[in-house]
Amino acid sequence: MTQIHPTALVDPKAELASDVTVGPFSIVGPNVRIGSGTRVGSHTTVEGYTTIGEGNTIGPYASVGGVPQDMKYRNEPTRLEIGDRNTIREFTTIHTGTVQDRGLTSLGNDNWIMAYVHIAHDCTVGNHTVFSSNAQIAGHVEVGDWAILGGMSGVHQFVRIGAHAMLGGASALVQDVPPFVIAASDKSGNKATPHGVNVEGLRRRGFDAGQIAALRQAYKLLYKSDLSFDEARNEITALLGQSDAGTAAPLRAFVDFLAATQRGIVR
């Protein structure tokens, strides 16, 4: 049965599955839905039009579903959707969306969100990501599946981080990171720059040698040649056309990401 601590304040209109746990001094608002097996720690606030799936763990002092930190916001009923089996640690803040975008902030499944992380309005976070402590993403940011954000990293609004990409700790990211690429600060400052393909991460996730070699070749065309961005993208597209079925999928993801960039890519 639902375990709600006597000091917790759960609005009668909130919808909680029968085995949800809510810790001491926590607050759950009227428009909140929480799925089976989710545990809400102590001193935590879950508010707004927020839907949380099954098997999540939300740590103490987290603020989930708060209003956007956007001066254009006028109390519209925007939403936050969180999937299943996510770990959201203490003092994390995740805000709802704005009507200037989709009106939705979303977090997928199996994400590991460490302490003091901020996920702003209208962000889209995929599955199996890792946000190290104090990672901060501004509004409208997209984070692909299996991406890793290092501690104390900061991401500018509207930036995209591709699947399986990695952002180093204490890095400032102002442009897109293509999938499978490592971006990190260098000796000249904290602005993130490209540092190769995330080879170790790809091996751990089952990518074979041929796929990794193809991605390395694409990376060299984009970053290690004298080609312009458009020329490099065309060469990578040609490489895709020559690839077998096994190597085509990651190359297609790489090419499609480049084609969709609005802010440009890290350089």
Swiss-Prot record:
Pfam family of this protein, just one? Acetyltransf_11
Top EC category: transferase
Q: Which InterPro entries match?
A: Acetyltransf_C, Acetyltransf_C_sf, Hexapep, Hexapep_transf_CS, Lipid_A_LpxA, Trimer_LpxA-like_sf
User: What pathway or pathways are given for this protein in its record?
Assistant: Glycolipid biosynthesis; lipid IV(A) biosynthesis; lipid IV(A) from (3R)-3-hydroxytetradecanoyl-[acyl-carrier-protein] and UDP-N-acetyl-alpha-D-glucosamine: step 1/6
> Which keywords does UniProt give here?
Acyltransferase, Cytoplasm, Lipid A biosynthesis, Lipid biosynthesis, Lipid metabolism, Repeat, Transferase
Listed GO biological process terms: lipid A biosynthetic process
Q: Which NCBIfam families match?
A: lipid_A_lpxA, PRK05289.1
Q: Please give the family membership noted in the entry.
A: Belongs to the transferase hexapeptide repeat family. LpxA subfamily.
HAMAP family from the xrefs? LpxA
Name this protein carries in UniProt? Acyl-[acyl-carrier-protein]--UDP-N-acetylglucosamine O-acyltransferase
Q: Which organism is it from?
A: Cupriavidus necator (strain ATCC 17699 / DSM 428 / KCTC 22496 / NCIMB 10442 / H16 / Stanier 337)
